[in-house]
Regions:
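Glycoside hydrolase catalytic-domain groove-lining segments
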Residues: 47, 51-54, 58, 205, ...
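Hydrophobic faces of well-ordered beta-strands that scaffold small-molecule active sites
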Residues: 25-30, 65-67, 101-105, 154-158, ...
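Sec-dependent N-terminal signal peptides
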Residues: 4-14
Length: 394
């Protein structure tokens, strides 16, 4: 039979009635909300009525809340925001609205991310063993405080954007070594957090979070070989107006690439993948709606993608934490609220319970055609169709 006809039949063989996953998390990280409230900020619905931010997230279609956890931000100079008491307070409010909860442990006094993994001031000078004990105790203390309130987190991130490790320098990935050996110190720190989570909440899903989906294929083989434990791969994905508009010139926009990488990671490592952070320029809410809708369409077409979380959507591009002035930082510009304190169109995709999903998607990356069909990744190469694992489809 003609190979082109075979390819067409292959695409059409999937039911055209594909729908969004019923368990797909639609979430928001609103960790700044208490600091904003203390600063006098209020939040309003489309009618202009003042609404509690957690209730407003519910009205906006969110099903889950993500909260970051810092060790001792007051010692760092930031104040008490995102410390244990603040986190528990916000978790109670989320629980009262019926949200699923994700905790995001940074194991730092301030933001830990791709370029910064500072050890908490109270932990500096610790031996590796003492650091593992501190990670365990910190994790357990927060989780036990939630347990005392009758709150069970569904997901727990052990570290934030840990592409290069965590709690530097003791938990950094050692790039002077090769293979699993370079991950050993980081894995010891990470596993201390993982086991603390499972000790308090055995059913909670532990996430290892990277700064981008493209990193999973080089990161997780050595992480696993070094004994790293995890249940879900988490990624950050921030598309931009600049790269989106460049598609008119023939470029592949990042949602296409991210969908392929998510499907590949899920197939390779056999675990779900979560978009733990996304956002788009607050100044372009109409385009944000288009781009985030496209992201939903692509990710809900992958059964192994567990959800999407918008990072600090309640910001408007003007408000910034007081401490940012000390650092010389500008306001975060990827929120999804207007300067009137109301949600913009950027959050509309979260309000749609059944975002239509494509039953297959096509993209060209690395000079081969990739097909996400019925949520599974296939490769078209030299007229033949292969699974993500390399087996030829007859």
């Amino acid at each position: 039979m003609n190979k082109h006809l075979l390819f067409l039949l292959f695409l059409l063989s999937c039911s055209m009635g594909a729908t969004a996953q019923s368990d797909f998390a639609r979430g928001a990280d609103i960790s700044w909300c208490t600091e904003m409230e203390a600063d006098g900020r209020m939040f309003y619905n489309a009618s202009g009525d003042p609404v509690d931010i957690f209730a407003l997230m519910k009205e906006s279609g969110m099903t889950a809340i993500r909260l970051r956890v810092w060790v001792n931000p007051a010692r760092y100079g930031y104040g008490a925001w995102c410390d244990s008491a603040d986190v528990v307070h916000k978790a109670i409010r989320a629980h009262e609205q019926g949200f699923d909860l994700m905790l995001d442990f940074h194991y730092s006094d301030f933001f830990a991310d791709q370029g910064r993994q500072n050890t908490p001031l109270d932990w500096q000078g610790y031996t590796p063993e003492q650091l593992d004990q501190a990670i365990t105790a910190h994790t357990r203390n927060i989780l036990l405080a939630l347990k005392d309130e009758g709150i069970t987190p569904r997901w727990v991130q052990v570290g934030n954007e840990t592409n290069s490790g965590m709690v530097f320098p003791t938990g950094a990935i050692d790039w002077n070594k090769s293979g699993a050996a370079r991950f050993e110190a980081y894995v010891a720190r990470s596993n201390a957090g993982y086991r603390a989570v499972k000790d308090v909440f055995p059913q909670a899903q532990v996430i290892i979070h990277l700064g981008g989906a493209e990193m999973a294929q080089w990161f997780f083989p050595d992480f696993q070989a070094a004994g790293g434990e995890f249940d879900i791969i988490g990624i950050s994905h921030y598309p931009t107006a600049e790269e989106w508009n460049s598609t008119a010139l023939g470029a592949t926009h990042s949602n296409v690439n991210a969908a392929q990488w998510v499907a590949e990671a899920a197939a390779t490592f056999g675990v779900p993948v979560m978009i733990c952070e996304t956002g788009f320029q607050v100044a372009q809410p109409g385009l944000a709606k288009t781009v985030i809708t496209d992201l939903f369409n692509r990710m809900t077409a992958i059964p192994q993608c567990a959800g999407i979380f918008y990072w600090e959507p309640q910001t408007d591009g003007l408000w910034r934490p007081a401490y940012y002035a000390h650092l010389g930082w500008n306001a975060y510009d990827k929120g999804a609220f207007s300067d009137t304190g109301q949600p913009t169109a950027a959050l509309a995709p979260f309000a749609t319970p059944d975002v239509p999903t494509a039953n297959y998607q096509l993209s060209t990356v690395n000079h081969q055609l990739s097909i996400i069909r019925c949520g599974q990744l296939y490769i078209l190469r030299n007229g033949e169709i292969y699974t993500a694992q390399g087996a030829r489809v007859e």
